[in-house]
């Protein structure tokens, strides 16, 4: 227990002495330490920290699990009161001992009243875990390497102890013009530097804080430094320029912070950092903060830090995302991404802020331009001037537009409150980038949503991302048109509620005339127009995502004969009911629910409308679906997951892993890479034929045939597929007699449409 917090000035082995030090005559910093010690000891419960990985010198690691161990229930606290009565008295001397949360309230930690007041005005009343972990070691002057999840309050973790010490140094002293900085904060991007400056200014308005970065006037920054400054925040390039120009002197820096340290010390930044470190006094306190901390960063960090204490609230656990972020993944084709994007934003952002991340500047511009037709959006990337960058970020923060399309320049350090949705338009290059992108939402304990777009060829990468980050995606389909319409209407209604009453008065006469003329349709027309749907929306396939197609579901009551066990039986049924539907049918997939013997398939919108109006043989039902049911190839495979597990739903001259459309679940055989197993049937990659027990007498077909979709699956319109215009199965060929069985009565020799018993 003596090494629990590694504080040489007060020993935990004598809690009574620590409590006594918290009396009225103790200094604020001493009272803070005493309160924290007594709280930690009492909550430890007689050595219970050992299992959680207590801090040990010299390079200690404090795990997040240790902090979770501190959060005991009220019942446990009451049980421990008798054993730790003297410690309880010490806490009361600090502030009454009204509970653990109160003991770690900002107001009860001995911080300067001015700092407490400004933090409370910002709604900050208690410490977050990273702030808790850093506070005491930082006040003791320890060098630190701190790691925590994105969006958990790292800026104030180093800001609070530094501000406290600067305020205490300045107490009773006059402000000296031309003073040189005592704090230097290095940040990898202009956006992060400005965020840090904003946090410090809002928390300590009486301290002079200057932010320096490239892309803006050099003279303005020179003048600000010449007037005297306490804290300098900036990017390495501009800081070096100011040092070389004689405008920035670092001889009195007592505190150095490297924020997003893994980027600061990456290739290309290390030399800049070393150049700056050469200008700093040897006697200083250095702290590195980052959401990710690879081993090689720690190695480099130890060159610049003195016996650093490592505070790691992530540890070796895979999950690095903040809790509260709901993750979705959606498989799409490259051509359907932009069409689906606006619908995803409409349904999942619900009128809130969205950041869409792209890989290239060109994509950012093009996606933003495409979205502008339906949703207000702007692009942010490296080619945009600093002035325009700031206008864009301010407009996004203020809600002047709701969608920001950005390259990864905005992923690190960009602090925009209340971002509801993150969309990865392209897969990130690495897990760390995914974590930082997604971390723009769900910040400070709030809920958020992140959606990953990927193509069929990227499934293995998505699986690797799940494994590396330790997360799980919910796989979704594009929103149905009905969902888009509903979300659009809700957003418009919320917007209408915000219209000023004085503005409404000007439009009442016109509204009354329109109401008399159109009745309820007047308001409905206004909602449709404001939602962007002045014209009827075009349907979109839930399978291929193509506009103008409708996905239908066919089911059969088990009491009415054999069910649909293959796409062939579906095309056969359609040919009996509607020759147009049989000719134009798109991809066909069987549903996974064995109790409901059915299938889903695509049809052009007009043909689907006609089919839905037709009378069907008894026991059969065709309905339009707004969400795909579970399909027979939804099961996991080696490198595929979600409901779209085949690259093209077919076998066009390549191996296709995952379950297929032939009526049975399958996967790779455990005894070899080259054998693919499907519900008892096998497909060998070294053989150009495949066994097909379900398609009538062991018919053999070359692998290059296509089954099931427009170009690559059963029910295709190509000449080599079931149910197509030139197909030998399921089409109405007047030159051949019908040899199958009627789907109505079960007798052979005639179709259901010609059945005498219907």
Swiss-Prot record:
Gene3D superfamilies noted in UniProt: P-loop containing nucleotide triphosphate hydrolases, Zinc finger, CCHC-type
Query: GO: which molecular function terms?
Result: ATP binding; ATP hydrolysis activity; RNA binding; RNA helicase activity; zinc ion binding
* PROSITE patterns linked to this entry: HELICASE_ATP_BIND_1 (PS51192), HELICASE_CTER (PS51194), Q_MOTIF (PS51195), ZF_CCHC (PS50158)
Span of chain positions assigned to the transit peptide in the UniProt entry: 1-62
**Superkingdom assignment:** Eukaryota
- Acidic residues biased stretches: 73-91
Where in the numbering of this chain does the Helicase C-terminal domain appear? 340-485
Residue ranges, annotated region (Disordered)? 71-97, 625-737
List all Basic and acidic residues biased stretches.
673-687
Q: Which CDD domains match?
A: DEADc, GUCT_Hera, SF2_C_DEAD
Which compartments does it reside in? Answer: Plastid, Chloroplast
For this entry, the protein name equals DEAD-box ATP-dependent RNA helicase 3, chloroplastic
InterPro entries, A to Z: DEAD/DEAH_box_helicase_dom, DEAD_box_RNA_helicase, GUCT, Helicase_ATP-bd, Helicase_C-like, P-loop_NTPase, RNA_helicase_DEAD_Q_motif, Znf_CCHC
